[in-house]
Amino acid sequence: MEERLQKLLSAAGLCSRRSAEDYIEAGRVTVNGQIAKLGDKADLSRDRVALDGVEIGPAAEPVYLMLNKPRGYVTTLSDEEGRPTVAQLVADCGVRVWPVGRLDLDSEGLLLLTNDGALTHRLIHPSHEVEKQYLVLVSGDMEAALPVLNGPMELDGVALAPAQVDRLGPNLLSFRIHEGKNRQIRRMCQQVGLTVKALRRVREGQVQLGGLKLGKWRYLTEEEVALLKAL
């Protein structure tokens, strides 16, 4: 059955439909060796569709994983500097999956991985405001910092969406945010004079890390997948 190229590229897990439109307009997509244009359709059972010369096949069976990422691993599939990657930790799943969003090199905890391009786009797009929770071990004056962390803040001159920050212990904070700016929590803490000693993501949406051991992964349950798709 013929389908629009942007739908085929997204279903193959290569990009979102919006990104696929940009790739088509840039001349990076071909059908049977001919440069495609917006509005073109193809049938993968008979047509050869390629992005940047790499041919795509029929959509793979969707796979959804949860990894408890250790510190020291980059949230990429490969690294030019030769650092350990999260892809190495889930290689035994037997399917090519990619991270949903990112988790800093020095951070640990819940990281979702999938080959579902549509769900990836939904979870990382700011308009969906998916809440994430982090446990953060800090040093510094927490009493003075808490009101500021819960109030209006900026990074690089841009206002942040409100965060919910609660004190759980003498040096332990819970951050609930639905943005994912680069090193956001560490930079927020730095602004209020706190030093981050450890940072762990424990929840994304309603999916929780639970007791999964550090460096291990598991498949999401059907219920967890449904919760993510409902966001």
What would you call each of these model-derived segments?
Residues 1-231:
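Basic, flexible Lys/Arg- and Gly-enriched helix-loop patches that mediate nucleic-acid binding at interfaces
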